[in-house]
């Protein structure tokens, strides 16, 4: 076992000198363990990751926890391998830190549990799945207008309080119930309170048993925030590669991954690039994103919450992320204020899977007609606000009439929100979704009151609600 000594500490970056030229490999984990000898010292159990070889038998490392209490001359031990984290069934229902140590006070992970290194190559070209396959979510607005691809990457945009967390929980629930799939949630550089709330909400809604959670939150050093996404990805890869599952990987927030990299970049001695970001920004993002894919065995579909600094979409961090995305789901506050949940914007959300050769001609035509109707309604709203509905042509009145029904029908009750709403959640297969919207566009339900279309699953539920009101169907 190779041993070295600390020779310099610069915040989260630590330089270590090894004797006799036995340098640890890049990405190797090094350990510093020190027992406090008096009340002025603190116990130290710190993991470092080798980032650079500086020459003169010295390596530069990134700390995975606080470097408080480190002093020059402390002994460092090379573990001989990268950071390795537990994988498999033992991770489900548990909460981990970047090193794969449980932090939920539910006991230790068994010593014989399998552990995999967090740094691994992306699947080889010949291992990738060749067919584009849609991942049915059971959420109408997503499946119809911005469908997810198995093994795809989805960007989730939305401010505070518009329903990102509830949408994430519903996706976890539906994948577990309908596809038997598991989910991994990686909390990257977000608020500890939000992570704690999510854990308890998932416990209450019953989806925690199909989920592994990994957190490297805002208060942690950049090393932990930079690597925690890889820890979550490694856990998800096991379920794909060893168990042939279709899993979900949630990363909240992918911007913080880039931000953490830029924090340590200058300390590592790299020349910053545009706006102070690390020069290796595209490489680091590519190494993470290329591992998230479909193979012949299974798939990892990734849903990544994306913070856009100052709403500037040309900022290098979000711009680098966009090039990897297959679909975007945009949550709109105005829709949430209208009581339309999920508050997904049907005109801004996009997907490369919305093409006739992938979803089929009928689905494609219905989706485009829905978007055209909603777009026309949006254009007419200014006229309605100034002059009122009476000034519209008969054709435009019909557009408004149907657009409002479509807008309400894009909403539905979620299983994970049952405890708050008292209404049972609904999972709607894609075929039923397409049929429902097609019939609305054809005018089959023009005679039904528009408020009956709100928060329902299949189109038959609208008819039943109207009948209950005594409306002729």
Swiss-Prot record:
Residues binding ATP, per UniProt: 158-165
Keywords: ATP synthesis, ATP-binding, Cell membrane, CF(1), Hydrogen ion transport, Ion transport, Membrane, Nucleotide-binding, Translocase, Transport
Catalytic reaction(s) noted: ATP + H2O + 4 H(+)(in) = ADP + phosphate + 5 H(+)(out)
Enzyme class name: translocase
InterPro entries to which the protein is assigned, alphabetical: AAA+_ATPase (IPR003593), ATP-synt_VA_C (IPR055190), ATP_synth_F1_bsu (IPR005722), ATPase_a/bsu_AS (IPR020003), ATPase_alpha/beta_chains (IPR050053), ATPase_F1/V1/A1_a/bsu_N (IPR004100), ATPase_F1/V1/A1_a/bsu_N_sf (IPR036121), ATPase_F1/V1/A1_a/bsu_nucl-bd (IPR000194)
Family membership: Belongs to the ATPase alpha/beta chains family.
Protein name: ATP synthase subunit beta
Organism: Bacillus sp. (strain PS3)
Taxonomic classification: Bacteria, Bacillati, Bacillota, Bacilli, Bacillales
């Amino acid at each position: 076992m190779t041993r070295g000594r600390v020779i310099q500490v610069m915040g989260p970056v630590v330089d270590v000198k090894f004797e006799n030229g036995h340098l640890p490999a890049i990405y190797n984990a090094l350990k510093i363990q020190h027992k406090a000898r008096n009340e002025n010292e603190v116990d130290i159990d710190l993991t470092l990751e080798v980032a650079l070889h500086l020459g003169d038998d010295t390596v530069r490392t990134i700390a995975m926890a606080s470097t408080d209490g480190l002093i020059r001359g402390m002994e460092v031990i090379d573990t001989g391998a990268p950071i390795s984290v537990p994988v498999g069934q033992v991770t489900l229902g548990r909460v981990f830190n970047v090193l794969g140590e449980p932090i939920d006070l539910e006991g230790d992970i068994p010593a014989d549990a399998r552990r995999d290194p967090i740094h691994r190559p992306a699947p080889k070209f010949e291992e990738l799945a060749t067919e584009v396959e849609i991942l049915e979510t059971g959420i109408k607005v997503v499946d119809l207008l911005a469908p997810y691809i198995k093994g795809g990457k989805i960007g989730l945009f939305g401010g505070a309080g518009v329903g990102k967390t509830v949408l994430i929980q519903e996706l976890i629930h539906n994948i577990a119930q309908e596809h038997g799939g598991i989910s991994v949630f990686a909390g990257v550089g977000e608020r500890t309170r939000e992570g704690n709330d999510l854990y308890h909400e998932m416990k209450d809604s019953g989806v925690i048993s199909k989920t592994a959670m990994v957190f490297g939150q805002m208060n942690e050093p950049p090393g932990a925030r930079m690597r925690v996404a890889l820890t979550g990805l490694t856990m998800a890869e096991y379920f794909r590669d060893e168990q042939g599952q279709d899993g979900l990987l949630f990363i909240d927030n992918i911007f913080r991954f880039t931000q953490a990299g830029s924090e340590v970049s200058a300390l590592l001695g790299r020349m910053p690039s545009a706006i102070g970001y690390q020069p290796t920004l595209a490489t680091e993002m590519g190494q993470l994103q290329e591992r998230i894919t479909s193979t012949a065995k299974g798939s990892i579909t990734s849903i990544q919450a994306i913070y856009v600094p100052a709403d500037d979409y040309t900022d290098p961090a979000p711009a680098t992320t966009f090039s990897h995305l297959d679909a975007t789901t945009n949550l709109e506050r105005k829709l949430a204020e209208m009581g339309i949940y999920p508050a997904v914007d049907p005109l801004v959300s996009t997907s490369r899977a919305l093409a006739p050769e992938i979803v089929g001609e009928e689905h494609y035509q219905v989706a485009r007609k829905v978007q055209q109707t909603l777009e026309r309604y949006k254009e007419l709203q200014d006229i309605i606000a100034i002059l009122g509905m009476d000034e519209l042509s008969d054709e435009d009145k019909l557009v408004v009439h149907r657009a409002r029904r479509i807008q309400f029908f894009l909403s539905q009750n979620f299983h994970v929100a049952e405890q708050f709403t008292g209404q049972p959640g609904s999972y709607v297969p894609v075929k039923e979704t397409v049929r429902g919207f097609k019939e609305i566009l054809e005018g089959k339900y023009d005679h039904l009151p528009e408020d009956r279309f709100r928060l329902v699953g299949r189109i038959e539920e609208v008819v039943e609600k109207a009948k209950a009101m005594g409306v002729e169907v």
